[in-house]
């Protein structure tokens, strides 16, 4: 079944209702995968449907994070024949999900990862990715004479920030300008088809 980029409720809810636990393969961008997982979450079948992913870009953060093949034919084979493994789903306080890379940039404010202060002041960017162990990992970047470099790393269940208005990006898509944002690990993992049969 073909759908538009970043499909929504009107395109997905009916086909997803008929899956009955069968595998679902998403071919597209990290943002497309996030849109499908959001619908699985909202229809209550997130943990019941194994999801395969064939990234349309060799630079997919999801493929890099979870060791998925970047060659489409190999990725499709794994998506169709692979075994599922639970991986964390990261949500945000605006009702979205993050499956690859979240970016806030530029940043002037305070950010916490769980109860640890990871930023107080200015940074070029703050990056968040899902993390198998705790739920998410955060990296604070500052620009110096030699370019951007990571100055702080942390992992935890949530990252919260308050700042002067800045831009938030989810999985390569500009989301909004805001002065506060939260990403957190959802209570239920999703089933990624990533282990060879």
Model-identified regions with their sequence ranges:
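Catalytic core of DAGKc-family lipid kinases
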Residues: 2-20, 28-34, 38-39, 43-170
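Extended, charged low-complexity segments
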Residues: 164-197
């Amino acid at each position: 079944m073909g759908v538009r980029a970043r499909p929504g409720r009107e395109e997905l809810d009916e086909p997803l209702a008929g899956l009955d636990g069968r595998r679902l393969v998403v071919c597209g961008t990290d943002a497309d995968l996030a849109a499908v997982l959001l619908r699985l979450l909202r229809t209550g079948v997130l943990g019941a449907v194994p999801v395969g992913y064939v990234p349309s870009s060799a630079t997919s953060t999801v493929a890099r994070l979870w060791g998925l093949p970047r060659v489409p034919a190999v990725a499709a084979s794994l998506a169709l024949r692979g075994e599922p493994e639970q991986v964390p789903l990261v949500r945000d306080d605006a009702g979205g999900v993050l499956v690859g890379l979240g970016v806030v940039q530029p940043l002037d404010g305070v950010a916490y990862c769980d109860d640890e202060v990871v930023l107080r002041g200015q940074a070029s960017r703050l990056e968040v990715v899902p993390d198998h162990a705790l739920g998410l990992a955060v990296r604070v970047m500052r620009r110096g004479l030699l370019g951007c470099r990571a100055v702080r790393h942390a992992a935890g269940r949530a990252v919260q920030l308050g700042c002067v208005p800045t831009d938030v990006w989810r999985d390569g898509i500009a989301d909004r300008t805001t002065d506060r944002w939260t990403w957190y690990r959802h209570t239920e993992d999703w089933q990624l088809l990533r282990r060879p049969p």
